[in-house]
Amino acid sequence: MPWITSLRQICTVTFDGTFDRIFDIGIPFDFPSGCAKIIGSYNGLLCLADIERITTSGNVIYLWNPNIRKFKRLPKPCLGQLDSVTLGFAYHSKYYDYTVVRISISHSMPPSEIEVYTLSSDSWRRIEMLLRSNIKFYDNNYFLPIPLVSGALHWMAGFIEEEEKHCSEMIVCFYVNCEKFRNLEMPDGSMTVPSFQICLASFKGKLAVITYRESEHYYQYTIWVMREYGVNESSHKLFVLPFGRRVAICIGFTENGSLLICGRNDQLENKKYKFVLVDTETLLEKDSDIQHASCVGTFMESLALLDGANMVSY
């Protein structure tokens, strides 16, 4: 499992189950902002993008296989410079291809602009979302990659009802093989309690909805998991992770279902936050040696990205 520090462009690879450090890798390319975010990782390829301030601009994107020491910078998106976008990275199982989806996030009214990059064509093209026009995409995942589950990328979005000026939460899916959008309902019960933050993740290959709630006395994460994909009735509350008065940020899940969190620890002198791996079955915590706020993705070695234009070996 690789993670990237926000202070130094270094990728650290750790064991998935224990988070014990294996080795560090210097990232062989630069970003204008000096900070990188892991957009996703599949079949040995990491997709990284630049971060400007607190938003992902997605104007500089790289595909990188550290195992074979090759990378390529993606061509400029056809939509050009955008203030804020959300990015998804996926493996195209039908054509053995890789896809990057770039969606503009508008702070006013939708619709959003959408474009798709494929590695085989090495080009971007615009696509239309044939759903309701008044859907507004959110970028609530922050450290978490946009989850790829059952061949689809998943975003939190809002359906703006014009007459009532009310925004209803929903999940929007992009199916990579057919390039079609559809929407999923939120799990029953997940919206009954007001939440400070809602994000999506892949938990052991299943779609998970994570709600973060804070009150005067405690902070907690509640994780809902869809046991049968596309069947809302199969969603169930898997567990609740209470953190007392400790502020915690969900960084990501490991392949075996452990949760990596970043929590404020005022007792530490040299760092404001500490990173903890939580066993979601026993709720036991294990400290990690991650020192700074990071983006995390799962990783498995491969020989992908051997061919193609604008490939750089180092």
Annotate each predicted stretch with a short phrase.
Residues 1-314:
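N-terminal entry/capping and adjacent linker segments that precede and initiate structured domains
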